[in-house]
Structure formats: C-alpha cells, structure tokens
Amino acid sequence: MPAASPTRAGQAAETQALEYLQGQGLQLLARNWRCKGGELDLVMLDADTVVFVEVRYRLHAGFGGALDSIDGRKQKRLVLAASLFLQKEPHWGNHPCRFDVVALQGSHHAGRPLQWLKNAFEC
C-alpha cells in the first residue's frame, strides 16, 4: 500500500485532533480558516474562550519534532491570522483567546497519543 501524501497525513492529524478536542468539550467554530495572513487549522470554543489550534504532524523527529516546528515566525503568522479572524467575526472579539498546539508524531498516528499544549505561546 502506498504511503499517504503529506497533505492527507496532515488532514488525518487534524481530524484526530478535532475529535480529541471535541471529546474534551471544545466546540468547533472554524476549520482550515484561510486569509492572506495564513491559515488557522482549528478555531474552537472552550467554555467562553476562543481557542486557535495549530495541529502539527511529523513522521520523524529528524529535523525536530512536531512541537519544535512552531518557531517565532510561525507564531507571528498565527497571531496575524487570529487577528484577522476576529476582525471578520467580531462577535468573538470580546471573548478571551488562547493559542494551543496539538502535536502528533510517527507513522500511522491514528490511535497514538497526541500532545495538547494549552496556551502554547503568548501573543
């Protein structure tokens, strides 16, 4: 059986992350929200808090693991995209916000534990 494309593997990781977070009580507001500033993988609501979730999947840790792949440049792009989301969806603007990261690593990640970092970085 051929290996899954990186795009498919990333989509599968996002689906796994979404299902996990929904199981933890979060509600989906948007998925793959795109703007000129970038893309938000998942935008969710945790009680009254708008949560911008970056899902990272890495097959190997050779160039750093999934969590290591979120550098300062990526954080700035996420903050910009989140700001644009809140401008386009002003009814969420008065809610507290946070940035979370869900990381999955390894082949056939379905069923493998994932790492959920709440408040992964400050903006």
Swiss-Prot record:
Molecular functions (GO terms): nucleic acid binding
Which Gene3D superfamilies does this UniProt record tie to the protein? 3.40.1350.10
Q: What superkingdom heads the lineage?
A: Bacteria
Record-stated family: Belongs to the UPF0102 family.
What's this protein's name? UPF0102 protein PputGB1_4524
Q: What is the lineage of its organism?
A: Bacteria, Pseudomonadati, Pseudomonadota, Gammaproteobacteria, Pseudomonadales
